[in-house]
Amino acid sequence: FSYNKFFLSYLRTFKRLELTAIPMAADTGPIGGNLSHEFIILADTGESKIFTDKRIFDLNSDGSKIEKKSLEELRKKYEKFYAVTDEKFNKNDFEKKVPEDYRLTTKGIEVGHIFYFGDKYSKPLKAGVDLPGGKKDFVKMGSYGVGVSRLVGAIIEAKYNEKDEVMKWPLSVAPYEIAIIPLINKNETSNLEKSKNIYNFLKNKNIDAILDDTDENFSSKIKKFNLIGVPYQILLGKKSYGDLIEFVETGKDSQSLSLEQIIKVLTEQKEKIWYLH
């Protein structure tokens, strides 16, 4: 049961990072046990060659209940589709189990690995619970690893637009949720005061904002935050929109919204991330 809970937790964690992870049946190796999965993120720079059924991408862990039967069914749903690294690849199996139109051969980065090895270690150590009648129930063990530094690389691989030189960190791990970027020069002084008011308003609404109050060139500021990867921006330039503010989701076109509408957008996005069911 615990193994399956971790299986679901890993899928949800990677989804919060806006990454599509493929769980693949893996060899337990010297660690032992009879159940193991590694989680692979597709990436051209990946070190692992993978062979999978494209239909696995249509699966969704949303709505999965934390119940023994439901979790086991979820895991088996994923295991139903062929997905292996080159260490376990068998050409005959691949061609037999996967229709030609659904075969995918590509590269990926391993970002997580989970093992269930039962009582392999607890039994020799006699680590368990004494039961009535002189019996003993040995502790069931597992190992659960996540490659944090690998995840950083995987996110950059997935979210950086090299052509436009724009990075957009997922909201769940972004250094800030929104950047306030005002045009400030000797001819434009009102923007600074306005940007400070917006900053304080957002902070009071528990929005993690950063204000660039330097006199750096306006377009350079925007380019800087595009590279840093803050997912949302408020731009205060020469144009006035009355009560509306120029709001940008990094890498997309801007739109004119009220401050209340911006709060709503950010709140809804955060709720999507943290309330996966």
Where are these regions (language model features)?
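NTP/phosphate- and nucleic-acid-binding module
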Residues: 1-277
